[in-house]
């Protein structure tokens, strides 16, 4: 198990995230996450841990125009803004009280490959507005920047039960490496 890393850690690996959306190794995750979003495009999609904006590009191509990307990595945000000039991106940390207060006015959240990186994942999720629609993804494999990983999709539900409502949830398992048995779990849910 790894440790929670500062923004600079992610900045040093930005090159591997500069691949165009169409060739991204996370493309399947992005496509499933977009499919699991609420059908209405009236609400702003808040993408926490937006990285280089590849998911934002998919949303734009699908007709979404209300989007806010948040990341604490300056390098990732610079690329996200360059890649998606029509969307808004801000620098922020999930532990920043001003960011948490700002998020209270939104109702649709996406956290792709975020929760495994933060120590206080439950506290952060608990701070989001009740009744919000959410799409989350987490891996079943370890990394030096992962503070946790989940061996099975049921472990995800067990960890966040009580904070997130998974009733009626669609659960998607994406195999990222057959040889290594790596998977990413994508789930839609509601904040309790």
Predicted stretch roles:
Residues 132-141:
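Conserved beta-strand signature within the Rossmann-like core of class I S-adenosyl-L-methionine
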Residues 108-119:
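A short SAM/SAH-binding and catalytic strip from SAM-dependent methyltransferases
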Residues 140-151:
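C-terminal alpha-helical "lid/dimerization" subdomain adjacent to the S-adenosyl-L-methionine
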Residues 43, 107, 132:
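Conserved acidic residues
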């Amino acid at each position: 198990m790894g440790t929670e890393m500062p923004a600079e850690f992610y900045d040093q690996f930005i090159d591997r995230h500069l691949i165009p959306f169409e060739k991204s190794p996370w493309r399947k995750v992005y496509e499933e996450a977009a499919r699991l979003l609420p059908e209405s495009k009236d609400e702003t999609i808040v993408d926490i841990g937006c990285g280089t904006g590849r998911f934002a590009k998919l949303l734009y191509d699908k007709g979404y125009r209300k989007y806010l990307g948040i990341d604490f990595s300056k390098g990732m945000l610079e690329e996200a803004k360059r890649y998606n000039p029509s969307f808004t991106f801000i620098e922020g940390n999930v532990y920043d009280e001003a960011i948490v207060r700002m998020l209270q006015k939104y109702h649709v959240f996406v956290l792709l490959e975020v929760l495994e990186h933060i120590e206080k994942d439950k506290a952060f999720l608990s701070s989001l507005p009740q009744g919000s629609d959410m799409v989350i993804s987490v891996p079943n494999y370890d990394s030096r920047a992962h503070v946790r990983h989940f061996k099975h999709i049921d472990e995800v539900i067990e960890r966040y039960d009580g904070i997130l409502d998974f009733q009626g949830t669609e659960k998607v398992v994406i195999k990222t490496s057959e040889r290594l048995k790596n998977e990413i779990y994508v789930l839609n849910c509601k904040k309790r």
